[in-house]
Amino acid sequence: DAPPVALFTTGERKVVDNRAKPHEIRVLIMGAAGRDFHNFNVLFRDNPDYRVVGFTAAQIPNIDDRLYPPALAGALYPSGIPIHAEQDLDRLIRTQHVERVVFSYSDVSHEALMHQASLVMAAGADFWLAGPQSTMLPAKKPVVSICATRTGAGKSPVARRVVSILKGEGLRVAAVRHPMPYGNLERQAVQRFAALEDLDAASCTIEEREEYEPHLAQGGMVYAGVDYERILREVEDQAD
């Protein structure tokens, strides 16, 4: 039998010990519609030891108040997973009896990160950062990663230059871009763009076109989307 739920009183606040079911840890994932979905897919989607009760969304406007759809969330989440505004974090931890919060986005200062950690722990939950060994995907083909510490640092022109150099060596090259998931997440699970008409078919935003069109103009192909593993497996068949 499961042990009884323990009820504590901390000052004027009652805290429920939600570990009565040790086989199912309640998780909330903090994100910005990118790494958060990937962390869910590789760490939690098919793991019955955890119950992801929601995502929070930051940085990008109008990406909250919707669902991570059932088709992407997997068999354990037939109703999908709600995406909330990050400003509701404290309330969600308390009302959803969250035991573990996984911080899953970048482009924040150390000070901002630790502020979030303090808020989470004050609400009673653990604060997690998922490391590379548990979340990186093994690739069968060589990968060149173009990274930067901040948005707008110039990754895109560097990526296009690298693609140009590799294509000049006679290699088949595909650019894989972090998604800009403003639309239908299910339709954006795996996206492949090889011509301007593909952008029209996908109803790409101006921001997406600004990113993808220069690759297409130099004869390249671009992959994007929410399910990174499915994207990787398709790219491995298309590129050297």
Report each predicted region and the residues it spans.
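N-terminal amphipathic/basic-hydrophobic helices that include classical n-h-c signal peptides
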Residues: D1-K14
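Glycine-rich adenosine-cofactor-binding loop
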Residues: H23-D46
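Short internal beta-strands
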Residues: Y50-N62, A175-R177
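N-terminal beta-loop-helix "entrance" segment that forms/cooperates
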Residues: Q59-G80, N184-A189
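Phosphate-bearing ligand-interacting subdomains
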Residues: P69-Q133
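ATP-dependent carboxylate-amine ligase catalytic core
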Residues: I165-D240
